[in-house]
Each structure stands twice: as C-alpha cells, then as structure tokens.
Amino acid sequence: MAATQELSKGGVEEAVEEDDPAALKPGAAPFGNFPHYSRFHPPEQRLRLLPPELLRQLFPPEGPERRPILGLDVGCNSGDLSMALYKHFLSPHDGETSSGTSRELRLLCCDIDPVLVERAENGCRFPDALTFITLDIMDQESRKVPLSSFLSQFGRSVFDIVFCMSVTMWIHLNHGDRGLCEFLAHVSSLCSYLLVEPQPWKCYRAAARRLRKLGLHNFDHFRSLAIRGDMASQIVRILTQDHGMELACCFGNTSWDRSLLLFRAKHTEETQAIPESSTKETGTD
C-alpha cells in the first residue's frame, strides 16, 4: 500500500509521508491510501526478501493446459507493488516468462480509493495480466460479485495466493478486533496461500498520533482494541488456530521492521519445499 535509505531502528513508525501531516490533506488517508506510498516504502524492500522462483515452486506446471496462477492483491494502492510483484515472479532473471517451464500469472488488484485505482490502471505496464478495481474488501455484499466474476473467468472458486501487504492495521483501526478477525477469516477462505505483511503495534500508535496532530478524532476502535502487542504473532495465532492455516515461511523483515509471512491452507498439498530468500533476516520474534 505506499527512501531507498534504510529507516532508523528507532523504527520510524511509518515512512515520512505517513507521519508528516503536511504531506497530505488532513484526513486524506484514513485507510492507508497515501498518494505516494511507494516513494517511502519501495517495492524493492519486499522483493529482495521474496525468492523469484516462489510461485513456480508453489504452483508447478500441471498438464498441457497449464492454467494460470491466480492472485489477489488487497490494498494495492496505485499499483506499484502489484506490478513489481508480477515482474518479480514472472522470471528469476530478466522478467520474461520461460516458455515450457512456468505458468501465466493473473492478478486482481483492489483498493478502496478510486483515485489510486485509476492511477494504477493508467500506469499499468501489464494490462493483460493485472486487473485493477475499486473495492472495499470489508463490504460483504459488494465484494462477492467482483471476486467471483474474476475467478469464474478461469473456472476457479478460489485464488492460488492472496497478498495482504501492510493492510491489516488499517482494517483493524477502522473495523476493530472483530473486523480484523473477519477480514483474516475471509481472505484465508479465498486462497491456498496467503502472504501477509502485518504492521507492528508501533505503527498503530503513529497512525493515532498523526490524527491528533491533524486535529481529527482518533480512530474509533484504537483504545478499545484487545488484540495488540506483537501483531505478527497475533495474526499467526488467529490464522493458525481459527482459520485452518499453517505458517509455511517467514521471509524476514523489511528495513522498516515488517515481516513477510507466508501461510498455507492445511488442505493444500505441499508440492515442493519453499525456497528461502538469500537476504532472509529475522523472524516474528
């Protein structure tokens, strides 16, 4: 969802734009929909932790038809990370599909902000492979049709993989503990694999402080949240204990101290060992 210099360990809770009220119109990003997110959290920081061959090993070619790998990117912002993930996973070397050894990748990318979605559509370098839509993933009624319509194009009922990159905090702050649990229940039901980048608790405090600086009301749920503390561990607990998933791999932490956690639905057949990143750093503590 939104420099290239490593952030200090004092853990700048969010990047400069996210913590500087002057960088945004007041209240302009209550859902993390920052207009220039990737300038401060560049895609490369995530990509260096994710093995390029990951999707090929999780979803090897099967049969002559080689149906495409289907992915859902929740909270895609203006699409920079979506496009970077697509190119990163397409080929381990030069961004070109190796014919005969890999499957096509099709991504449905959604965000709650129509302005960011329009920017993503206009700037998309892979329009045949990436579809951008405006969608509130927490709206149980409005999400049904676009998700099922995309899947039905390929004769599928679930995605192969769902990406939730730095979105859990915004769901949590805007919808409370119940909303976070409902979100995790829903996305885990949609896929075989789930890649989550949870924001740590210090980011919650920074988001609340930013609203106070802007003279706005605090997030309605912030002070009443019972799920708090080590958010990576909390999300692991919810997904593994309540929603039939298992933690398959932690690929390490970004320079802004967010872990990349890959979960696998327990009913999913494990095809090959998950490759580790050559730059793997730390786990969830």
Swiss-Prot record:
GO molecular function: O-methyltransferase activity; pre-miRNA binding; RNA methyltransferase activity; small RNA 2'-O-methyltransferase activity; tRNA methyltransferase activity
Catalytic activity: a 5'-end 5'-phospho-ribonucleoside-RNA + S-adenosyl-L-methionine = a 5'-end (5'-methylphospho)-ribonucleoside-RNA + S-adenosyl-L-homocysteine; a 5'-end 5'-phospho-ribonucleoside-RNA + 2 S-adenosyl-L-methionine = a 5'-end (5'-bismethylphospho)-ribonucleoside-RNA + 2 S-adenosyl-L-homocysteine
Keywords on record: Cytoplasm, Methyltransferase, S-adenosyl-L-methionine, Transferase
GO process terms (BP): negative regulation of pre-miRNA processing; pre-miRNA processing; RNA methylation; tRNA methylation
One Pfam family in the UniProt entry: Bin3
Top EC class of this enzyme: transferase
Chief location category: cytoplasm
Cellular component annotations (GO), alphabetically ordered: cytoplasm; cytosol; nucleoplasm; plasma membrane
Residue positions binding S-adenosyl-L-methionine: 46, 77, 111, 136-137, 165
Keyword Methyltransferase among UniProt keywords: yes
Region entry Disordered, spans: 1-28
Location in the cell: Cytoplasm
Residue ranges constituting the Bin3-type SAM domain according to the UniProt record: 53-275
Tagged with keyword S-adenosyl-L-methionine: yes
This enzyme's EC code(s): 2.1.1.-
PANTHER family: BICOID-INTERACTING PROTEIN RELATED, RNA 5'-MONOPHOSPHATE METHYLTRANSFERASE
Function: O-methyltransferase that specifically monomethylates 5'-monophosphate of cytoplasmic histidyl tRNA (tRNA(His)), acting as a capping enzyme by protecting tRNA(His) from cleavage by DICER1. Also able, with less efficiently, to methylate the 5' monophosphate of a subset of pre-miRNAs, acting as a negative regulator of miRNA processing. The 5' monophosphate of pre-miRNAs is recognized by DICER1 and is required for pre-miRNAs processing: methylation at this position reduces the processing of pre-miRNAs by DICER1.
Subunit composition and interactions: Interacts with DICER1; the interaction may be mediated by RNA.
Family of this protein: Belongs to the methyltransferase superfamily.
Protein name: RNA 5'-monophosphate methyltransferase
Organism of provenance: Rattus norvegicus (Rat)
Taxonomic lineage of the native organism: Eukaryota, Metazoa, Chordata, Craniata, Vertebrata
Gene: Bcdin3d
